[in-house]
Amino acid sequence: MMRALGGVLMLMITCAAFPALAWELQWFGQSAFKVTSPGGKVILIDPFITGNPKTPEALKDLAALGRVDLILVTHGHGDHVGDTARIAADSGAKVAMNADMGHTFGNLGIVPYKQLIRFNKSGPIQPVEGITVTMVHAEHSSEVVHTDPESGAKSVHPGGEPAGYIVELENGFRIYHAGDTGVFADMKFIGEYYRPDLELLPIGGHFTMDPAHAAYAVNKLLGSRKVIPIHYGTFPPLKGTPEAFKQALGETRAEVIVMEPGQVLKF
């Protein structure tokens, strides 16, 4: 009897700490997301917001983001770096990225070294309490185009290798943000080893997977459970659509969740 009561008490304590183990995901368009974890940690991924044609105007006030604990940047292109510098300065958030790009950010003063987390593929890190992040491969390119704040002159700097991220929340839920990527064979390893619960996959084509390639990745490599299509429709070359993605998938076990920019999902 006492053992049973102890089990009930432990369940009540767990639920009080993380009510229903719920968490939220907000999409700003392109590849930009805000994750609010079960423990209240706020994580931004590729925060391209103020310059994003798909982000609703009401959400372009960066102050409205409130607390930010961590920013993850997949690679150095402007539509992924986005507002990283401003948000980091305003919030004091840690900023995690590949080690080489981290040096570029630090040396150019984009983000102070004291806020940077420079790491690399495979080895997991815990940048904030309760959140585990693993960097994985992405088939793309990376460079940092820096605009001098005084002269306005642009210069190009090393961006290291592009990446995707496996983000594991306090409740064990795993998100795979693929970054910008083409399809690659080791997606099979990502699916088998990390077993993501939710995948955020680019479908726009031209610079990344198109709907057919993304569908192949889902059905043949990742073994996806839930998929949110991203990185489409923001600029003219990104012609892939969720409808074409669904058609290319055919019969599949994956649940496709199509979000609207600004929308918040609760899991």
Model regions and ranges:
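Pre-active-site segment of Zn-dependent metallo-hydrolases
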Residues: 38-78, 82-89, 112, 142-157, ...
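Short internal beta-strands
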Residues: 93-100, 226-231
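Metallo-beta-lactamase
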Residues: 28, 99-173, 248-267
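Zn-dependent metallo-beta-lactamase
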Residues: 2-42, 49-51, 251, 261-263
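Cap/insert and terminal regions of metallo-dependent hydrolase folds
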Residues: 70, 182-263
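Active-site environment of divalent metal-dependent phosphoester hydrolases
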Residues: 51-52, 78-82, 102-105, 123-126, ...
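Structural motif
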Residues: 41-43, 69-70, 131, 173-175, ...
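Divalent metal-coordination and catalytic microenvironments
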Residues: 35, 46, 75, 83, ...
